[in-house]
Structure formats: structure tokens, C-alpha cells
């Protein structure tokens, strides 16, 4: 049973973690009609394009520092309740700016929620700044430059998400160079909607230590071997992959094939209520796919080893995992 296992998550978009009931309440608070995006207590979307539209709507009903603080605190307390000891939240200041909130105010609100959750539960959390791919290379470059000049102790990484089929990875490489030179950890969404070539482009042009999703690397055996050889960690989101029809079902999901080939992976929920999942559920899904508790513990260790966090905190997290009877096996 995975319920008792300690957990860690590296891939979750904060607005995408907002439950429909909270979003409906926020919409009512601001006099916004949510009926096009929430029906019968669930989010309404049909494909990736409509999912992005629904996500943007959800983001639009959080409008103040207090709103974002409450969102971050609620999600982290939920995670802590299922034995999660570490979380990285993907945060996009573009969403704050879209509702008239400065990037700095957006971050400070989220940080307030993170600190409150840590005080109440002990969960550690860091933020990874997102550049939105579908807003174009210049916008992502602007975000990286902002990040290089804005130092916050809870911001430790840079990422790019959004519509993977727009533009070339090469168009965004300068933004990642800026973030890397400023000392931030690098991850990037690839190998989800697009095939193995997008993972290869990410490795060649962005040089990340982690890749968000990356599961379509399975289409290229040489690329799978390269991932294994280089130790790049895939942030795998099983329920998300099925909901977005990246794979037809869990039987055809390549997580087992990837781990058998020596690729390092960890378990994540992505945008949980959009995909009728949670981190606890994705851990249970991994078990249903045939992974043992020992293997799943190793994935949690991998997540902590790959986390964008200072070494003192990393070692503390690893010690907590060890003390719980986990982490004795070699990381997957």
C-alpha cells in the first residue's frame, strides 16, 4: 500500500492544483461566470487546447496575494496529509500579471502560503518559475531576465510549459542560458504532446537536469539509452498522460519500460483536479502498474536527489526518508 509511503513531488502547476469548489467560490467572489469551465463539480475540457483555456480561466479567479497564499497553503496541507515531505510548485508570474498583480506580489503571496504550510505541517516546498511557451520566445526570455534579477529564497528553478507544439526549442534556448547562469535549476516540458525529437532537442539545446514528462522518449531506443547514461530525471505524470491521451491506457504507458532501461523517474500529479487525480492517487497508480513499494520509494529518493534545493535541506529530506524505512535501495 502506497498510502503510508513518504512522498515527494517535482511537477505540479499551482493553479492547476486548485479544486473546482475553490475556483467556483473564487469566481463567485469576483462576480465571474464559471459555468463554461465547471460543471457538476468538475472542470470541463476536451483536448489540450481547451485544457489550456480552462487552466487560464482557473488562474484568472485568483487575483490578490491573499488568494494565492490560500491556494498554496491549501494544496501543501493536502500533500502533507498524504505523507508528502517535499513539493516543487510550478508558478507563472504571467498569470498574476494577467489579473493586474505584479510578478513580485504574485510570488510573495505564494511564498506566504508556503511558509504557513511548513509551519503547520513541516512540508518543504520550493517554486520553479514557468515561462509560457505559447506566449512566445520573447516573453519567455523576458521572464528569464526578470528571474535573473529577482532573488527569492524559495525560487530555485526555471521551466517552460504550455503548448509544446508551438515554435522550436531553439527559439527559447537563450532564456534557459540566462536562468542557468543565474544559478537556477533547469527543467523543461518535452516529450508529452510531441515525440521523441522534442526530448532530444531539449537535451541538446537546453541541457536540463530534469524533463517534465519526457515519456515519448520511449519512441527512440537510442534516446532512452542517452537519458539513462546522462542520468536526466523524467518527471512522470501517469494520470495526466492518460487523461490527455498521450497514451491510451496504463497498460501502454512506458514508465516500466523506461525504468527497466535505467532511466531515472519520479511520480507527479501535474494538474490533479483537471485529471481526476492526486499525488496519492498517482503513487497508487504506480503500484497498480506493477511497481513495488521498494521501487516507488526509490523514485521518491530520485525526486529528492533531483530537487532544486540546497544541500542541507536535501540531506534532511533524505534522512527523513531513510528514517521511515525508505531509501535503502539504489535510486531508479
From Swiss-Prot:
Question: InterPro entries of this UniProt entry?
Answer: A_deaminase_dom, ADE, Ado/ade_deaminase, Metal_Hydrolase
Q: Its GO biological process terms? A: adenine catabolic process; hypoxanthine salvage; nucleotide metabolic process
Instruction: Return one GO MF term.
Output: adenine deaminase activity
**Listed EC numbers:** 3.5.4.2
UniProt xrefs under Pfam families: A_deaminase
Q: Where is this site: Important for catalytic activity?
A: 213
Which key words are in the record? Hydrolase, Metal-binding, Nucleotide metabolism, Zinc
Q: List required co-factors.
A: Zn(2+)
Q: Catalytic positions? A: 192 (proton donor)
What is the cofactor note? Binds 1 zinc ion per subunit.
User: Which positions bind Zn(2+)?
Assistant: 11, 13, 189, 270
Q: Which domain of life is it from?
A: Bacteria
Which residues are involved in binding substrate? Answer: 271
Its catalytic activity? adenine + H2O + H(+) = hypoxanthine + NH4(+)
Which function does this protein serve? Answer: Catalyzes the hydrolytic deamination of adenine to hypoxanthine. Plays an important role in the purine salvage pathway and in nitrogen catabolism.
> Which family does the UniProt entry place this protein in?
Belongs to the metallo-dependent hydrolases superfamily. Adenosine and AMP deaminases family. Adenine deaminase type 2 subfamily.
Query: What is the name of this protein?
Result: Adenine deaminase
Q: Which organism is it from?
A: Allorhizobium ampelinum (strain ATCC BAA-846 / DSM 112012 / S4) (Agrobacterium vitis (strain S4))
Amino acid at each position: 500500500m502506497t498510502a503510508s509511503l513518504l512522498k515527494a513531488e517535482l511537477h505540479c502547476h499551482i493553479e492547476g492544483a486548485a479544486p473546482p469548489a475553490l475556483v467556483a467560490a473564487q469566481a463567485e467572489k469576483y462576480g465571474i461566470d464559471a459555468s463554461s469551465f465547471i460543471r457538476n463539480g468538475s472542470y470541463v475540457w476536451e483536448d489540450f487546447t481547451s485544457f489550456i483555456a480552462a487552466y487560464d480561466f482557473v488562474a484568472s479567479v485568483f487575483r490578490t496575494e491573499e488568494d494565492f497564499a490560500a491556494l498554496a497553503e491549501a494544496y501543501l496541507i493536502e500533500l502533507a496529509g498524504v505523507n508528502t515531505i517535499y513539493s516543487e510548485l510550478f508558478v507563472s508570474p504571467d498569470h498574476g500579471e494577467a489579473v493586474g498583480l505584479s510578478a513580485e506580489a504574485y510570488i510573495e503571496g505564494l511564498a506566504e502560503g508556503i511558509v504557513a504550510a511548513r509551519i503547520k505541517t513541516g512540508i518543504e516546498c520550493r517554486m520553479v518559475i514557468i515561462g509560457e511557451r505559447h506566449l512566445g520566445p520573447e516573453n519567455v526570455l523576458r521572464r528569464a531576465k526578470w528571474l535573473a534579477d529577482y532573488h527569492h529564497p524559495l525560487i530555485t528553478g526555471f521551466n517552460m510549459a504550455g503548448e509544446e507544439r508551438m515554435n522550436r526549442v531553439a527559439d527559447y534556448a537563450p532564456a534557459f542560458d540566462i536562468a542557468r547562469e543565474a544559478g537556477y535549476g533547469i527543467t523543461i516540458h518535452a516529450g508529452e504532446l510531441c515525440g521523441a525529437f522534442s526530448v532530444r532537442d531539449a537535451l541538446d539545446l537546453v541541457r536540463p537536469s530534469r524533463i517534465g514528462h519526457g515519456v515519448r522518449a520511449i519512441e527512440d531506443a537510442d534516446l532512452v539509452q542517452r537519458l539513462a547514461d546522462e542520468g536526466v530525471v523524467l518527471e512522470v505524470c501517469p494520470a495526466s498522460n492518460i487523461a490527455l491521451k498521450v497514451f491510451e491506457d496504463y497498460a501502454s504507458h512506458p514508465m516500466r519500460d523506461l525504468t527497466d532501461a535505467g532511466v531515472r523517474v519520479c511520480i507527479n500529479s501535474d494538474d490533479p483536479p483537471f485529471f481526476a487525480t492526486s499525488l496519492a492517487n498517482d503513487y497508487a497508480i504506480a503500484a497498480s502498474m506493477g511497481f513495488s513499494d521498494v521501487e516507488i520509494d526509490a523514485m521518491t529518493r530520485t525526486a529528492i536527489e533531483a530537487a532544486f534545493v540546497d544541500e542541507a535541506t536535501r540531506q534532511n529530506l533524505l534522512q527523513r526518508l531513510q528514517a521511515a524505512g525508505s531509501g535503502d535501495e539504489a535510486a531508479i
